[in-house]
Design a protein with these regions (language model features):
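Start-transfer (signal-anchor) and selected internal transmembrane alpha helices
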Residues: 1-38
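Extracytoplasmic loop-helix module adjacent to an early transmembrane segment
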Residues: 28-35, 42-70
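Transmembrane-helix signature of polytopic, membrane-embedded enzymes
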Residues: 29, 122-141
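Short hydrophobic/aromatic helix or loop-helix immediately within or flanking a transmembrane segment
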Residues: 54, 58-62, 69-101
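Alpha-helical transmembrane segments and terminal signal-anchor/GPI-anchor hydrophobic tails
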Residues: 54-57, 63-68, 90, 192-303
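Transmembrane-helix motifs of polytopic, lipid-linked glycan transferases
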Residues: 109-126
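Multi-pass, polyprenyl lipid-linked donor-dependent membrane glycosyltransferases
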Residues: 136-137, 147-162
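Membrane-interface transmembrane helices that cradle and orient dolichyl/undecaprenyl
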Residues: 161-174
């Protein structure tokens, strides 16, 4: 608890320092500061921290005794014969070990890639240092337990998915394709990235929200069926996974609040980003720590970090009180959980 509280305090102190200047330059400096702090928090963790960091460490060490021929053979073995998975991550480890065989340095590389994308996200969709603080605390509360201490392959894939979205928005389609290919060979769940440009391009937000609501009902009624189907497809035994009620209520309420505040947003890019995030709303019944479908939603719910402070900023009454309450909640949840 003390370790997590320390980093929360550092982020708050950074906000107090950079908020004095109230300029876009100070906002950007605070974003850089935050990315460095959160990156160090992730990279400096012990290999025993996190659900599977130690397993990743063992695999990293095993790659040292894997030949290049075996690495390249893993691609046809995986995609032609179904033997193996995510050969791109194996290739990444092997290339990295040309320069360093230290797993700690590898964790630094992962942190740099992810928090570079994180900083780009904040630079594009925040307006002031208070919004950046809210994003940082929201990350510490909602996403630290995955991106910062476990799930290295998907952490990379989600970082690439953010850059993939920006490339699509900026009409850099070749870069889009390359990012998708790299993300897919690192983690096969990245195939769901193909939904991102489709959802982003839909202009009728209200109609899409109704469709999400209908899907929500279908998934809620048939939850066990869909979750077990995903477990079987992922080569896991079909089991009953409990519904994470508090997390589901949070996303349900937050989705409605964001829509209520942003539906008259002048910035079309924000409304399109809401389309991407709001797939989380439909997916809520399928969430659960042991559900493979939880991994799918990570490509979409990350955008709640920038949409929530944006929605609060558009609230005409009790704006500061709302920021205070949500940040207090995030601090409590960040320190008390994981």
């Amino acid at each position: 608890m003390a370790y997590k509280l320390l980093f929360v305090v550092i982020l708050v102190i950074g906000y107090l320092v950079y908020n004095q200047y109230n300029s876009d330059s100070s906002r950007r400096k605070y974003i850089t500061f935050s990315a460095i702090v959160l990156g160090l928090q992730s990279a400096l963790r012990n290999v025993a921290v996190g659900a599977d960091t130690y397993n990743y460490y063992l695999k990293f060490e095993a790659v040292k005794y894997t030949t290049w021929q075996e690495v390249f053979r893993s691609f046809p073995d995986t995609y032609l014969y179904g033997d193996g998975k995510d050969p791109g991550y194996l290739l990444l480890e092997k290339i990295f070990q040309v320069f360093s065989g230290d797993f700690r340095v590898f964790l630094f590389l992962i942190a740099i890639v992810f928090f570079y994308a994180y900083a780009k996200l904040l630079s594009r969709y925040t307006n002031n240092t208070l919004e950046v603080l809210t994003v940082n605390l929201g990350y510490s509360a909602l996403f630290y337990g995955f991106y910062s201490i476990t799930g290295i392959r998907q952490t990379l894939s989600v970082a690439l998915s953010i850059l993939f979205l920006f490339s699509f928005i900026d009409k850099k389609y070749l870069k889009c394709i390359l990012l998708f290919i790299v993300a897919f060979i690192i983690h096969k769940s990245s195939v769901f990235l193909l939904l991102v440009p489709v959802l982003y391009s839909i202009k009728k937000n209200k109609l899409l929200l109704y469709l999400y609501g209908l899907t929500f009902i279908v998934f809620l009624v048939g939850r066990n069926y869909f979750v077990n189907l995903a477990l079987v497809a992922s080569d896991y035994e079909a089991v009953e996974i409990p519904l994470p009620i508090l997390l589901d209520i949070f996303y349900f309420v937050i989705s409605l609040f964001i829509w209520k505040r942003l539906k008259y947003e002048d910035n079309r890019e924000i409304l399109s980003l809401f389309n991407v995030f709001c797939l989380t709303f439909a997916w809520i019944p399928l969430l659960g720590n042991d559900s493979p479908l939880m991994r799918v939603i990570l490509y979409f719910n990350i955008y709640v970090l920038v949409l929530l402070p944006r929605a609060i900023s558009r609230t005409s009454f009790y704006r500061n009180e709302l920021f205070f309450c949500i940040n207090l909640f995030f601090i409590y949840y960040a320190v008390d959980s994981h």
